[in-house]
Amino acid sequence: MKSDYDTTSEEAGPSQQEIGRWPLALFILHRCLAPYFARPEPYQRVLLYLQAVLSEIPRKNGWQIAEHAKQARPYGMQRLLSRAIWDDEGVRNEMRAFILQTLSHPSPVPLGAPSGTKPRIPFPVIVIDESGFPKRGTHSAGVKVQYCGATGQGENCQVGVFLTYVTDLGHALIDCALYVPADWCTDAARRQSAHLPETVRFQTKPELAQHLVQRALSASLPIRWVVADTVYGHNTDLRLWLEEQGFSSALAVPANEVVCVETAQGYRICEVASIERQRPGATLDWQRLSMSQGTKGERLFDWAIVPHVHRGIVDGCHFVVIRRCLDDPREIAYYLVVTAPGTSLHTIVLAIGARWWIEVDLENAKDLGLDHYEVRSYTRTLL
């Protein structure tokens, strides 16, 4: 979900030089996908489909994709995305491997900078976020009136949970899952009409996010940090699971999230919004730091870090990080952070700043037709 102060724009999209390299990369990728297609027709058609979505046609729907591919009717493209037999999970896994190869160094990038040098983002970072896709009808899998991040209000829409993978070489969406509301999961007729597999049960968005991160972990993706907004940070189970996997994490939480911190009266349980009032001397050590470079310049905020009690002790690994807007000091965000002892606040801030790359990736994906899809069934909805 995009913040009011986010500065991503068309300038954050791919450059003409990058676009010029797409055809060769596309042919290489297409060759990698061959084992996942049982017949030559859909395998050849998927190349035409990918060429169309990378083109500048105004809408990436069945008719316009077919016209770009010099096909008289859209039925072949529609069949490719709905009923044609091919291994969509295998294609997803191959795409993820292709992205990992593209965004990886031959040797690991050091976690921290040498003493006295400028901190840098602790790559690789996994970013979790969701996106909504407004719909007019009621038959697409999982559609209902619910919060839609694309419009900032309740809409008849589908919602997907997404992962972006960020390294110093670039960033890309690597996985997604369709959120299926509980009332859909218990409606046998709707399940049948949308081809929901029997294995699909209701999962909250944080549960879907955990499943996606587990899938990335099972695919041996190197991961150092996981960052996400309050939808995911407010979920205790997800936070604990990420810590159990050994990841550093910086997850936004609402102002009423409860922690135990040192106060003037000793250790007390309080809401994160009241930490400054509770602190001895009622002061925090604020530092003005940039979380990333935006299209309008450095994204500067004031930041403070406070250790909090975890399992009865202050262990030097668990913190509340507070971000205050320069233009309006009343605009404050809170993060629960788990990281290695000695990690600098600036490094944590840079990890948090990596979250905005998923906004860029979702914008670029929608430019390529992510929100133009016409598939109603569950299996290939977010292709």
PLM feature segments, named:
Residues K2-Y5, S9-V226, V231-S248, A255-V258, ...:
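Conserved, well-structured functional cores that handle cations and Mg-NTP chemistry
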Residues W22-L33, V46-L50, M77, L81, ...:
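Generic structural signal of hydrophobic/aromatic residues within well-ordered alpha-helices
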Residues I128, G132, Y232, R277-G281, ...:
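Short amphipathic alpha-helical "interface-anchor" segments enriched in bulky aromatics
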Residues A141, F202, V320-V321, I352, ...:
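Short alpha-helical segments used as structural interaction elements across diverse proteins
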Residues L169-A194, E198, A250-I358:
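An anionic, glycine-rich sequence signature occurring as long contiguous blocks
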Residues V375-L383:
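Membrane-interface transmembrane-helix boundary segments in multi-pass integral membrane proteins
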